[in-house]
Amino acid sequence: MAFDLSMPILVVDDYNTMIRIIRNLLKQIGFENVDDASDGSAALAKMQGKKYGLVISDWNMEPMTGYDLLREVRASPELSQTPFIMITAESKTENVIAAKKAGVNNYIVKPFNAATLKTKMEAVFGSAA
């Protein structure tokens, strides 16, 4: 199953610069329908009103971390099937394992580029058409 370039994507990060970088990388891949949120709580609020094809979230945010957002998404019957990629500087093995156990679909350690992001997305959705 290939990913749909028109699917809405939610980028969650507390740094506007990182949101812009991820938006630009997604645009390089061909995605235009990208929303953003500054933390997990704001992301959950947006997810209540719109069905996203993918959530890309940072791990370290306040007041709600990306890890906590992932756990909330997976616990929600309405949201639990939403694909989720964690993008973070947290490369510690225990964090990767915790995210996998919580149900993350893929995990990217910063820094990264468009090719890395696309490869990780293809691993979640299958190769692009």
Predicted regions: what they are:
Residues A45, Y67-S80:
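Short amphipathic alpha-helix used as the core "switch/output" element in two-component signaling
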Residues D36-A45, G66:
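Helix N-cap/capping motif at the beta->alpha junctions
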Residues N16-D35:
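Two-component/phosphorelay signaling modules centered on CheY-like receiver
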Residues M61:
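Receiver (REC) domain active-site loop signature in two-component systems and cognate sites
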